[in-house]
Structure formats: C-alpha cells, structure tokens
Curated annotation (Swiss-Prot):
This is Chorismate mutase 2, cytosolic. Gene3D superfamilies: Chorismate mutase, AroQ class superfamily, eukaryotic. Its EC number is 5.4.99.5. NCBIfam families: CM_pl-yst. It comes from the Eukaryota. It holds the Pfam family CM_2. The lineage of its organism: Eukaryota, Viridiplantae, Streptophyta, Embryophyta, Tracheophyta.
Length: 253
C-alpha cells in the first residue's frame, strides 16, 4: 500500500485500500467457488516430498514472485518465507511510514488454517472435477488477498498510534494487550463493514439475465453473501486487530 503524500501515512489512503480489497476478496471467492472442493489437491503426495499440491504450488509461486520483486512491502507477507530468493530485478523502494520491524509481523499461519479448515467448506460444494492445478491457483489468489487485507492492519495501527500517541504508549509500556484491543475496536464501524461486504457479494455474485422481472435470492448467488459477512466478522477483522496489537506492542522498540 502506498501512502498518500510522500512519507506521510494517510488515513484516507488506508481506508480506500481496505474498501478496494473488499472487492478483491469477494471476486476471489467467487472464482474459487466455480470449482468443487477437490480434496485430492490437499492430500500429501510422496512424489512431492509429502507436500500437498497446494503447498507445493504456493511455495513455487512465492519463490517466483520473490524473484520478480514481490514481498518488498509490509502488507505483502509470504506464507513460506524460509529461503525465499532475492529479487532479480530493481524494485522501487516504498515510503518508510512504518516501524522497521513491521515486515516481521505476520498471522499467515492462522490465515492458512482458517482458509482450509473453516472457510473453504463454507463456500465450495463437496466434489471432485479433476481441475486440481486451477483449483490451487485460485486458492492462492484467495490466500494472497486475505493476507494482504489483514496485514494492512499494520498501517491502521500506525495511523491510530499517531492519532493518540500518549494513550497508546502507556498501554504499550504496560504490555496491556486487552486494553489495546479495546481501543482498536469500533463495533459500529465493524457492523458497517459486514453489511457492505455482504451487499457486495450479493451484487457481484448475481447471475445477470435480460429478464427485467428476474429476482435472485441469496441461494442463487455464486457465493452466499452471508459467508462474506461471517468471514469478516469471525476472521478478517479479528485477525486484523491481532496484527494491530502485535505491531503496537513493538512500536516503541
């Protein structure tokens, strides 16, 4: 995410990025929902060192992305950071608006587990169409956009810290995670976000026809809109706040 105005982090830029990523999350899930669960894509294979196809694909894709210069921004966090290659091409430095340790703050392990254990069964049907390579490519797209959305919490935390540095500094020095979480939580805003992503899923996921009288219920949407609301309520926003708290606890280091 680029800060607006040079090295000054803009609250408006952070909000705009979060809203834009809502669209990306909805579309990523819609694309993945075109295929059934395809369980063999997640089974360990002896020919791949006991890795599953999805793990192999993500590792290889991240290595290629790293060579091209990806993962240079704090919100772009790899799922398998061990031994990633260095970029082979010049990259433009991002404005230094966060604490230097920001790139080390990650909840990708929790995102991975949530996606495969909890979320995927909610919006895909049980079945096997054999399209395993395409399936894991779409899984990667979902994982990447969810990870980026959640790790933008680093910027949210920095903006909030600068808005009330004395209050946050006191809690940080006391290592009071619970009070930090309370300060970062705005229930009214979270309710608006849940309603907005649900509406986007209903709008983007409808099957468009030329029949002006056609009305589609949620059951006819490509992804149940309530799944998006649940995704943000139970996982995206809580994990984002986990990122914010972890970032803030080290903000004064």
């Amino acid at each position: 995410m680029d800060a607006a105005g040079g090295d000054q982090l803009s609250l408006a830029a952070v909000r705009d990025a979060l809203v834009r990523l809502e669209d990306s999350v909805v579309f990523a899930l819609i694309e993945r929902a075109r295929h059934p669960r395809n369980a063999p894509a997640y089974a360990p294979a002896a020919t791949a060192g006991e890795h599953s196809l999805v793990e192999f694909f993500v590792r290889e894709a991240e290595a290629l992305n790293a060579k091209a210069g990806h993962y240079q921004k704090p919100e772009d966090v790899p799922f398998f950071p061990q031994d990633l290659p260095s970029p082979l091409f010049p990259t433009k430095p991002s404005p230094k608006v966060l604490h230097p340790f920001a790139s080390l703050v990650t909840v990708n392990d929790a995102i991975w587990k949530m996606y495969f254990d909890e979320l995927l069964p909610l919006f895909t049907v049980d079945g096997d169409d054999g399209s395993y390579a395409q399936t894991v490519a779409l899984d990667l797209a979902c994982l990447q956009v969810l990870s980026q959305r959640i790790h933008i919490g680093k910027y949210v935390a920095e903006v909030k810290f600068k808005d009330a540095p004395q209050e946050y500094s006191r809690l940080i020095k006391e290592k009071d995670s619970n009070s930090l979480m309370d300060m970062l939580t705005f229930k009214a805003v979270e309710e608006k976000v849940k309603k907005r992503v649900e509406k986007k899923a209903r709008t983007f996921g409808q099957n468009v026809t030329l029949d002006d009288n056609a009305t589609a219920g949620d059951s006819e949407c490509k992804v149940d809109p309530k799944v998006l609301s649940k995704l943000y309520d139970q996982w995206v926003m809580p994990l984002t706040k986990d990122v914010e708290v972890e970032y803030l606890l080290r903000r004064l280091d």
